[in-house]
Amino acid sequence: MLDPDKPTPLYRQLAAILRGQIERGELTGRVPSIKTLAQTHGVAMGTAERALTLLRDEGVIVMVIGRGAFVNRSGDA
């Protein structure tokens, strides 16, 4: 659950939630779209996009233009 009163930025909180879902095997394959994440978690699309960008930069997911974001199965994360 995202908490706007925490000092941690919302995009980092969302990234942590998604990372946890991936680590627990709850999120595999395709990651929900930016729009879906924004609606589901009650944040702006820019916040959801920033969360996915952070996970991409960490190697947790890969983003393919025109196709979406996917859990990185290569083990590089």
Give the ranges of each region predicted by the language model:
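Minor-groove-contacting beta-hairpin "wing" of winged helix-turn-helix DNA-binding domains
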Residues: 67-73
